[in-house]
Swiss-Prot record:
UniProt similarity note: Belongs to the class I-like SAM-binding methyltransferase superfamily. RNA M5U methyltransferase family. RlmC subfamily.
Residues the entry annotates as binding [4Fe-4S] cluster: C4, C12, C15, C93
Record keywords, A-Z: 4Fe-4S, Iron, Iron-sulfur, Metal-binding, Methyltransferase, rRNA processing, S-adenosyl-L-methionine, Transferase
Role according to the record: Catalyzes the formation of 5-methyl-uridine at position 747 (m5U747) in 23S rRNA.
Chain positions recorded as S-adenosyl-L-methionine binding sites: Q218, F247, E275, N321
EC number(s) stated in the UniProt entry for this protein: 2.1.1.189
Pfam families referenced in this protein's UniProt entry, alphabetically: tRNA_U5-meth_tr (PF05958)
Name of the featured protein: 23S rRNA (uracil(747)-C(5))-methyltransferase RlmC
Gene: rlmC
InterPro entries, sorted: 23SrRNA_MeTrfase_RlmC, MeTrfase_TrmA_AS, MeTrfase_TrmA_CS, SAM-dependent_MTases_sf, U5_MeTrfase_fam
Active site (UniProt): C348
Entry superkingdom: Bacteria
The organism of origin for this protein: Haemophilus influenzae (strain PittEE)
Reaction it catalyzes: uridine(747) in 23S rRNA + S-adenosyl-L-methionine = 5-methyluridine(747) in 23S rRNA + S-adenosyl-L-homocysteine + H(+)
Length: 392
């Protein structure tokens, strides 16, 4: 069991499974996954052993609510979201790399120097709401974002920035996010960059990826790299030349698979990636260019838009990595109609995935593997490779 002072003192209970031995956590997650798929024919499925995480120090991102005073800021959480007096400082949270606590100490000093008064929820006054810190495991470089109520402190931040960069030379991307509302919203729409660089370079399995502000990126790099590598290995076994990556984000799945397929089969691979976030599409397109993948088209669209394009060349493989709600009945039925040879389904919610697989009546699961992306909690990721059923 992790030695966590915050849990033992009942200050933070985010890690609800902390007292459960790790191997038991894995067993319970595997049992839960199988229960969600109980109505499917899994008789011929190859169940791979769960991919385990490090138990602590595995997170590459810290989301710290800022409270307290400008002289003594507190970075962590509020036990009671409406009570600034319930603040808990989580700078030594064991889920973060140990060196994050040193960075937090430097940032507290910066908050004082720049006069960033922590936002007081009860009084609806103050400026600084959150500090968001992300680290690239490939380079050790950092992305730092200050979530502020207004632009009022921008001149002071710019004035103090050179001193901060002296103390933290690994800071690659620094930005201000403006969130003016008095609401439980993490970030606003407007991002003001204080550095020339706007993306944090990462690299998994030789695939360059770019983490961007306001964008989704897995918070457990070791397990994320394992997830992408497994997807790559599974699909490279088959002669696939045309693939779609729906809900593609920064292109992790599609780029891994396209590169492996091109190397394995020696032919150009056509990759179409669909993602609603335009900044994610920029990042994915940049990665494809670095990899020298020429027949790649990343588009900023809703995943449902693929159902409107009847003339698109039919894919051999469709990758889906939807949000927790799953892909739904309509998209499932569309996939049944266009009948790609394979579907690779990555899910963070086995319950909705189980329902989607019931709708995918033309497909049977070949391989299933659990990835423990979120140790000390009941959550996990799962990867399923589906093959089109042979018609007798």
């Amino acid at each position: 069991m992790i030695d966590c002072q915050y849990y033992q003192q009942n200050e933070c209970r985010s890690c609800q499974w902390l007292e459960i031995p790790y191997d038991q956590q894995i067993a319970e997650k595997q049992h839960h996954l199988k229960q969600q798929l109980i109505s499917l024919d899994c008789s011929d499925v190859h169940w791979l052993a769960p991919f385990k995480s490090n138990e602590q120090g595995f997170r590459n991102k810290a989301k710290m609510l800022v409270s307290g005073s400008v002289e003594r800021p507190i970075l962590g959480i509020l036990k009671n979201p409406n009570d600034p007096q319930s603040a808990i400082d989580l700078c030594d949270c064991p889920l973060y790399p140990a060196h994050f606590s040193i960075i937090f100490s430097i940032l507290k000093d910066f908050i004082g120097r720049a006069g960033l008064v922590p936002y007081n929820i009860a009084k609806q006054k103050g400026e600084l709401k959150y500090i968001l810190l992300t680290e690239s495991i490939a380079t050790g470089k950092l992305m730092l974002r200050f979530v502020l109520r207004t632009e009022n402190k921008l001149p002071l931040i710019r004035r103090e920035l050179p001193k901060l960069l002296e103390k933290l030379p690994h800071l690659e991307v620094i930005s201000i996010n403006l969130q003016p509302q008095h609401a439980a919203i993490l970030e606003g729409e407007q991002e003001i960059f204080l550095t020339e660089q706007q993306f944090l370079p990462e690299n998994f399995n030789g695939i360059p990826l770019f983490i961007r502000p306001q964008g989704f990126f897995q918070t457990n790099p070791k397990v994320a790299a394992g997830l992408y590598a497994t997807a790559q290995q599974w699909v490279a076994e088959f002669p696939i030349y045309n693939l779609w990556d729906l809900f593609c984000g920064v292109g992790g799945f599609g780029l891994h698979c396209a590169k492996a397929l091109q190397e394995k089969w020696g032919k150009p691979i056509k990759l179409t990636g669909i993602e609603i976030s335009s900044s994610a599409i920029l990042a994915a397109s940049h990665s494809a260019k670095i990899l020298g993948l020429e027949h790649v088209n990343f588009q900023s669209l809703n995943a449902a838009s693929v159902m409107e394009n009847k003339n698109e060349n039919k894919p051999d493989l469709v990758i889906v990595n939807p949000p927790r709600r799953g892909i739904g009945k309509q998209l499932s039925e569309f996939l049944n109609q266009i009948q790609p040879h394979f579907i690779l389904y990555s899910s963070c919610n086995a319950m909705t995935m189980g329902k989607d697989l019931q709708h995918l009546t033309c497909y049977k699961p070949l391989k299933i593997q659990l990835f423990d992306m979120f140790p000390q909690t009941s959550h996990y990721e799962v990867l399923v490779l589906l093959e089109r059923k042979k018609i007798n």
